């Protein structure tokens, strides 16, 4: 892309720019890609998205490339190993949330519901187009 228009939040970090230009704002329909996104979004709680992006490959390695069939069988020893992995966020609740997400993913599948179909059903299977202008976090005082 030659001089694409970018949102101010991505700044000039090459990883963030790549994410902005190739991932952000593009509809995703693949069940496993959406499962990974759900898990990574949960890891972001209280942190910046760039923090998670910088650790994304570490997460893929640590969580068997977000394979719910494998994650659902993680035992206490595996949880402890994850909590000692310096390449990911080492928070017990966040680790456990990925395991619970895997259970939910497989439960939907076992009921014949695709994860993508489940998520997209909340927006009538259509992306929401938000054309509003950037709104600053602070408003100037009224005159």
Regions found by a protein language model. Name each.
Residues 1-143:
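HhH-family (HhH-GPD) DNA N-glycosylase catalytic core used in base-excision repair
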């Amino acid at each position: 892309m030659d001089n694409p228009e970018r949102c101010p939040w991505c700044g000039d970090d090459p990883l963030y720019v790549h994410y902005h230009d190739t991932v952000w704002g593009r509809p995703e329909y693949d069940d496993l890609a959406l499962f990974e996104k759900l898990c990574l979004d949960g890891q972001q709680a209280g942190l910046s998205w760039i923090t998670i992006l910088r650790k994304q490959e570490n997460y893929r390695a640590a969580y068997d490339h977000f394979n719910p069939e494998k994650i659902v069988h993680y035992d206490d020893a595996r949880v402890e190993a994850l909590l000692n992995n310096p390449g990911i966020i080492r928070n017990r609740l966040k680790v456990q949330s990925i395991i619970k997400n895997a259970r939910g993913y497989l439960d939907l599948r076992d009921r014949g519901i695709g994860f993508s179909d489940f998520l997209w059903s909340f927006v009538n299977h259509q992306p929401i187009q938000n054309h509003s202008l950037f709104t600053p976090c602070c408003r100037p005082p009224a005159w």
